Curated annotation (Swiss-Prot):
Binds 1 [4Fe-4S] cluster per subunit. The cluster is coordinated with 3 cysteines and an exchangeable S-adenosyl-L-methionine. The lineage of its organism: Bacteria, Pseudomonadati, Campylobacterota, Epsilonproteobacteria, Campylobacterales. Gene3D superfamilies: 6.10.250.620, Radical SAM ThiC family, central domain. It comes from Campylobacter jejuni subsp. doylei (strain ATCC BAA-1458 / RM4099 / 269.97). It comes from the Bacteria. The gene is thiC. Zn(2+) binds at H267, H331. Pfam families: ThiC_Rad_SAM. Coiled coil: none annotated. The keyword Cytoplasm does not apply. This is Phosphomethylpyrimidine synthase. InterPro entries: ThiC (IPR037509), ThiC/Bza_core_dom (IPR038521), ThiC/BzaA/B (IPR002817). Pathway: Cofactor biosynthesis; thiamine diphosphate biosynthesis.
Length: 430
């Protein structure tokens, strides 16, 4: 089976590439060149028939991913499907099913069947439930069986923590972290490695993993098991050593035509973000960077969507290609529907803010909003807003008598005042 990368290397412009080129207003040659060299990916499993393809990477708009899925404390698949509907409503490009309890295949199959967004999973989360074995009883190649099952089901990308190998764990053990390993998948693999006194199975059998990805054109999202879970731990030796391992794994994947993106931090002080984005691009030769946040402070519990949006905007402006949303429930509980909505909107704002910096053409929508505000065209403002539904609701909650203003300024509306005076009209404030 040929992947999007293989086709690009041969100069074949696939239907998925055509769709992405039209969405992003890019030329055929630009897209082919950058997919061929790995700077742009189009995650598109051959079995995901409902997919509306999107590209991730150099010269493209920053994409947003929404996480959902059940845990052993919250098993309500119907609510998770409502989150999927909400993600579709806001035009989210990627959805990850992070279910880590029970038999997850039925939900995942339904997700692939109905979702036009690209679907991602973390197979190691599903290992215990799928294999019906406790962690210590799982064999190295058993993990590949889970990967194969996910690939065959139609998921477009998978987080695989292949970089936390024996070399990286050696560096980690010497680190003086406050929060050790905060990646769920990374912690599970590290525990397995320590209990079995064995190498990371995804690293040891990486070539077998690539064969699975090739068969279904699954994009590898190389997970950062050693991402910083606190600003104290950011940019330390453990994080960077794993990134170096991921750069080597990226090249091995490219050599056979498997598409790759790199996952990144995490928690990180705002002044470290730009350098980390540049470091990933340098080490991984321009591979797309997919970051969680980053959260720029550790004390925003209940408001971590704000911390994440601040970091995400800086990251996107500095080269990050996809942002994983953060909700107000981060670090506290499984998010509910309102949490998901708040997280989506905050992250879409961050992504767009970053795009204004790196893709000047993306300012056009903002300019249209500014014109609508000057013209006091409320309906146009609601249409252009990222969350126009909420904007309209808030406006109507204290609807002004004079629609040439809002209830904040009333007759002292600056826009209306200037519109009148520049037309040569008198301005009355009584």
């Amino acid at each position: 089976m040929k992947t999007q990368m293989n086709y690009a290397k041969e100069g074949v412009f696939t239907k998925e590439m055509q769709i992405v080129a039209q969405k992003e207003n890019l030329s055929k040659d630009f897209l082919l060149e950058n997919i061929a060299c790995g700077k742009i990916i189009i995650p598109a499993n051959i079995n995901h028939k409902s997919l509306d393809p999107n590209g991730i990477g150099f010269g493209l708009r920053t994409k947003v991913n929404v996480n959902l899925g059940v845990s052993n404390d919250c098993v309500d698949y119907s609510e998770e499907m409502k989150k999927v509907e909400l993600a579709h409503k806001f035009g989210i490009e990627a959805i990850m099913d992070l279910s880590n309890y029970g038999k997850t295949s039925r939900f995942r199959d339904e997700l692939v069947n109905v979702s036009k967004a690209m679907i991602g999973t973390v197979p190691v989360y599903d290992a215990v439930g799928f294999l019906e074995k406790d962690l210590k009883q799982i064999g190295a190649k058993d993990f590949l069986d889970v990967v194969y099952h996910h690939a065959k089901s139609g998921v477009d990308f998978m987080t695989i923590h292949a970089g936390i190998n024996s070399r990286a764990t050696h560096i980690f053990k010497q680190s003086k972290r406050l929060t050790n390993i905060v990646s769920r998948g990374g912690s599970v693999l590290y525990a397995w490695m320590m209990m079995k006194d064995a190498e990371n199975p995804f690293f040891e059998y990486y070539d077998d993993l690539l064969d699975i990805c090739l068969k279904y054109d699954v994009t590898l999202s190389l997970g950062d098991a050693l991402r910083p879970g606190s600003t104290h731990d950011a940019s330390d030796g453990a994080q960077i050593s794993e990134l170096i391992e991921l750069s080597l794994l990226t090249q091995r994947a490219w050599d056979v035509g498997v598409q790759v993106m790199i996952e990144g931090p995490g928690h990180m002080a705002i002044n470290e973000i730009e350098a980390n984005m540049q470091l990933e691009k340098r080490l991984c030769k321009g591979a797309p960077f997919y970051v969680l946040g980053p959260l720029v402070t550790d004390i925003g519990a209940g408001y971590d969507h704000i911390s994440g949006a601040i970091g995400g905007a800086v990251a996107a402006a500095s080269g990050a290609d996809m942002l994983c949303y953060v909700t107000p429930a981060e670090h506290l509980r499984l998010p509910n529907l309102e949490d998901v909505r708040e997280g989506i909107v905050a992250t879409k704002i961050a992504a767009h803010a970053g795009d204004i910096a790196k893709l000047p053409k993306e300012r056009a929508r903002d300019d249209e909003m500014s014109k609508a505000r000057q013209e006091i065209d409320w309906e146009k403002m609601f249409k252009l807003a990222i969350d126009g539904e909420k904007a309209k609701k808030m406006f109507n909650e204290r609807r002004p008598d004079d629609l040439n203003s809002c209830s904040m300024c009333g007759k002292m509306c600056a826009m209306n005042t200037m519109n009148q005076i520049l037309k040569g009209e008198d301005v009355s404030l009584v």
